[in-house]
Swiss-Prot record:
Residues 488-500 have a biased composition (Acidic residues). It comes from Human cytomegalovirus (strain AD169) (HHV-5). Glycans are attached at N37, N591, N661, N801. Residues 482-508, 910-941 are annotated as: Disordered. Keywords: Glycoprotein, Host nucleus. Its main location: host cell. One of its GO terms (cellular component) is host cell nucleus. It is found in: Host nucleus. It holds the Pfam family DUF587. Transmembrane segments: none annotated. Belongs to the herpesviridae UL87 family. Residues 910-929 have a biased composition (Low complexity). This is Protein UL87.
């Protein structure tokens, strides 16, 4: 049959045109010529004709759909994309272009519909067939633009984009004489339908039936959102109107049907809000139970209250602040409290119709005003129903509740629920909510409110549906546009990587989808190779809870390890009441210290410190300040331990990291003293030898042996500071980095997720230096590769539980306080000294600078001299070679004075004109002769 609609047979549907009948064609007709809108003159009359009731012919509707389906461009090949293009034309809606035809062409065009109307605006004068000599000259027409003339015909069709009509045959010739070329640069055009295939209002739901055979409702919604964003705000109202027509919202049901549908729709929305609440217990179920019960009792008032706009100020006559704070906490709503000034909002009718131009979503009680977020208007209205409309629910509902007059609802109704005799909807944890109407209490109450006329109810129903349907789509698209304008193109590409494609257009308007898909494929293939890179790790809890934050600049990489973080969060006390008082009270164990300055109790354990700020306003909410080191799961574990000691009912996540301290080591530096000697705009602390550099309003402290601490920041802010510090180090004049060692130690840190202890680092340093001494500098690359492969295979792995040189509370809790006190020390000059007194990150040159030659055996001094000589031969800067030469000169001179180890100092490799700052000697290593006792032998090692 000619014009048959596409049907699903297997996977793809085909349009089969049977017989010898020619398929009716859709032609391209301009709607803007020389900045003149040709559709404006007939818009009122055509809208009236379009809305006029008319019997629907299903076969004609299928023929219209088939004609539009065939009118798709050639590059749109798949069935869903072709149906989306048909949907796009239907969303833009019908248009009409007036024209005046002379006797030569009258009656010859199958697309010209006869009419008689005087047009003051522009219209097309179709005067003859084009005689330009082109291929289509015998078919196409020519036109000119007229004004103040009578229109004899009308061209009707659907508004389309010009890019959709590129391959459609044009009704007018494209030559300059024909006039068709003048409208090709406009954005919009018309897909002109034959005269017997014109559309009417009642045809749209039947066209949606044809679309629904290919596309789902969610795909249609996504496409509508994409088209609205692509065409802009000017075309959005037109798209929304035709979108509603596709779903038959123009069909006005009878009054009882409309009321029942509206009630069911509100019940469905309230149930969706209830299922979206995270906590299902007595507080949340009592709130929604009262709202639903009031909806069944007084449906009209509650529905009007739930539709209050954000500009309307809601006044309450009954309010309980402690209960409200607890409800807001469990619903996770952001509210702010203030004073309600007189004159900002005048109270009236059902909730105060006065407006405050400066504030929105206000809920006022006496002098107190509560401001909700811009997206929480529905929640504001729910609280208005709960406290104002449902305050006397106990006298009319299914269970008796104490009625409060003036000062709020009694605390006895805090845990009340609806009667189990009602038809209920059960939540996941057993709490039930009513979803059916309550029985009518009395005839007087039933007839207390006058009924509206049927037409007003139907109109109200359509308004409610339209508001609830399109508010979410518009809000989602505005957020997407705002995020795209703020973050730019890079974040959009990252969104494509992560799979969040809700806001991306599902249809290729510009023809760039294939190229973007290819670029995304290449990017994913590149990232698949780097799946084990630190930047690709998935962090539980986000970057704020990352134990390791790594950045790299050129070939320099730095890993910052979190030492401790301070986390703020809220918690609610459990329902365990004090004996005989009926009031919740915190259970304070003996290990919690009380602060006499404020309402604070401190809970200290080796793993964490929790400061509890107790509320004194009977809200039963505690503010927690947690000081801990560890990952997000360890933080949750510490909260569980804290919950065993204190009667906490719920912790409210997500937690906020307000302070985070990190520590980092710069590996591979040949001379670690350069970092603190070649920095400008710094200052030194007086009580401790620490250099402070100010970066992004954060004071970064640099200690000896290229170790730094970064306070207060974490996540992206920490990465920005690390990049700036690396940039300063990279631009220093005398900085030389051994990238072989740098790569090995960076890999060790990432492999063990902990900073390298002093002994583990010295083992790798001296082992590599001895290998260089044995095999020479020519084998340096092979030796560096060998050491790196050994580190990758775990030969130099270490345990963070053995790094007791830093008294970390979390580490002490894991290994025990007795083992944590066994700090590795050495015996120097009959005194115990920590192994890392020179710095945990000290390298060979830093260690040898502090060695006194006359205090160590001759054989070990010889090894040190040979190691320094090997390092001097591979050094990359004259400054480092000069420092090594001075160290060798000091060691050999001191040894020659006693044992004659070096007959003469080694030759100077570079000029000694530049002065090197001397580093004060702190502690020397003992052992002038080979020790005999076991304790002395351990100390010498």
């Amino acid at each position: 049959m000619a014009g048959a609609a596409p049907r699903r047979l297997g996977c793809d549907a085909l349009i089969v045109v049977g017989g010898s009948a020619m398929p009716r064609r859709v032609l391209h007709v301009p709607v803007h010529v020389r900045a003149c809108n040709l559709t404006q003159e007939l818009s009122t009359g055509e809208d009236a004709r379009f809305c006029r009731p008319r019997p629907v012919n299903v076969e004609r509707v299928r023929a219209v759909f088939a004609a539009l389906y065939r009118a798709c461009p050639i590059h749109v090949r798949t069935e869903p994309e072709r149906v989306k293009l048909v949907l796009g034309r239907l969303l833009l809606g019908p248009v009409a272009v007036p024209c005046f035809c002379d006797g030569e062409v009258e009656g010859h065009g199958e697309h010209l519909v006869p009419t008689t109307q005087f047009c003051r605006g522009p219209l097309l004068y179709v005067h003859r067939r084009c005689c330009c000599g082109s291929v289509t000259a015998g078919r196409a027409l020519s036109y000119h633009v007229l004004e103040n003339h009578v229109a004899t015909h009308v061209l009707r069709g659907l508004l389309s984009l010009t890019e959709w009509n590129r391959e459609l045959p044009s009704l007018f010739c494209d030559c300059p004489g024909g006039g068709g070329a003048s409208g090709t640069e406009e954005r919009y055009a018309m897909a002109c339908l034959p005269r017997d295939l014109s559309l009417h209002l009642d045809d749209y739901p039947y066209l949606m039936v044809e679309i629904g055979r290919v596309l789902s409702v969610s795909e249609v919604d996504d496409y509508v959102t994409a088209v609205s964003g692509y065409l802009g705000e000017a075309a959005a109202p037109r798209i929304q109107v035709h979108y509603k027509l596709l779903f038959g919202l123009n069909v006005r049901p009878q009054a009882p049907c409309a009321l029942d549908a509206t009630r069911d729709f509100f019940l469905l929305e309230l149930q969706k809000l209830w299922l979206g609440v995270e906590y299902h217990h007595e507080v949340t179920s009592e709130f929604f139970g009262r709202v639903l019960a009031q909806l069944h009792r007084d449906r009209a008032r509650v529905m009007m209250a739930l539709r209050l706009p954000e500009q309307t100020v809601c006044h309450l006559s009954t309010f309980v602040l402690s209960r409200f704070k607890r409800q807001v906490l469990y619903f996770k709503l952001q509210v702010s409290y203030g004073k309600c000034r007189t004159g900002h909002a005048d109270r009236s009718g059902g909730g105060g119709n006065g407006g405050n131009q400066g504030h929105h979503n206000l809920l006022c009680y006496r002098r107190l005003s509560v401001t909700f977020a811009d997206t929480d208007t529905v929640w504001r209205n729910l609280f208005y129903v709960y406290y104002e409309l449902a305050r006397d629910l106990g006298s009319h509902g299914t269970e008796d509740r104490p009625v409060s007059r003036g000062y709020g609802v009694s605390c006895a109704s805090r845990t009340s629920r609806l009667s189990p005799s009602e038809s209920t909807v059960v939540s996941a944890n057993g709490h039930a909510l009513s979803s059916t109407a309550l029985p009518t209490t009395s005839a007087g109450h039933k007839l207390s409110l006058p009924r509206d006329p049927a037409a007003d109810r139907v109109r109200r129903y359509v308004c409610i549906i339209s508001r609830l349907m399109y508010a979410r789509y518009g809000e989602r698209w505005r957020k997407h546009c705002q995020r795209r304008s703020e973050t730019g193109e890079e974040e959009e590409e990252e969104t494509l990587e992560s799979g969040e494609t809700d806001a991306t257009p599902p249809f290729d308007f510009t023809g760039q989808q294939l190229r973007r898909a290819y670029q995304e494929h290449r990017r994913r293939k590149h990232l698949a190779v780097q799946r084990y890179a630190p930047c690709r790790r998935k962090l539980i809890g986000g970057m704020e809870f990352a134990e390791v934050t790594g950045v790299s600049l050129d070939r320099i990489a730095v890993n910052a390890f979190n030492t401790n973080r301070v986390i703020n969060m809220k918690a609610a006390l459990s329902s365990i009441a004090a004996s005989g008082l009926g009031v919740r009270a915190p259970r304070l164990p003996k290990n919690m210290t009380h602060s006499f300055v404020m309402y604070k109790h401190t809970f200290k354990e080796p793993a964490c410190t929790v400061s509890t700020f107790v509320s004194n306003d009977a809200v039963y909410i505690n503010s927690l300040n947690v000081n801990i080191r560890g990952s997000y799961p360890e933080f949750l574990y510490s909260l569980g331990v804290y919950r065993l000691h204190v009667n906490i009912d719920h912790f409210f996540l997500p937690a906020v990291v307000c302070n985070s301290n990190s520590s980092l080591d710069v590996h591979g530096l040949e001379d670690q003293a350069v970092i603190r000697s070649e920095r400008s705009k710094v200052y030194w602390t007086t009580n401790f030898p620490c250099m402070i550099s100010h970066t992004n309003n954060v004071n970064v402290g640099w200690f000896k042996a290229a170790t730094a601490i970064v306070p207060r920041v974490s996540g992206a802010d920490l990465e920005a500071i690390l990049l700036k510090e690396l940039s300063c180090i990279k631009n220093m004049r005398d900085v030389c980095i051994d990238y072989g060692l740098h790569r090995v130690f960076t890999q060790l840190e990432l492999r063990n997720s902990y900073q390298i202890p002093f002994l583990a680092k010295q083992l790798v340093l001296f082992l590599r230096a001895c290998l260089l001494k044995l095999h020479g500098r020519e084998k340096r690359l092979q030796l560096d590769r060998l050491v790196f492969e050994a580190a990758q295979r775990g030969l130099f792995d270490y345990s963070k539980n053995l790094t007791a040189h830093t008294k970390i509370k979390h580490t002490c809790a894991l290994i025990g306080s007795r083992l944590a006190n066994n700090v590795p020390k050495i015996l120097a000059r009959n005194k115990k000294v920590k192994l890392d007194h020179l710095g945990r990150n000290a390298n060979v040159l830093t260690v040898c600078r502090h060695v006194e030659a006359h205090k160590i055996p001759r054989t070990r001094l010889k090894v040190l001299v040979e190691v320094l000589g090997a390092l001097q031969s591979i050094s990359g800067t004259p400054h480092t070679r000069e420092v090594i030469h001075q160290t060798l000169f000091r060691l050999c001179s001191a040894a020659a004075a006693t044992s004659g180890l070096c007959s003469s100092p080694p030759p100077l490799c570079v000029s000694s004109s530049s002065s090197v700052p001397s580093v004060p000697t702190s502690v020397s290593v003992d052992g002038s002769s080979e020790p005999t006792s076991p304790r002395a032998r351990f100390a010498s090692r």
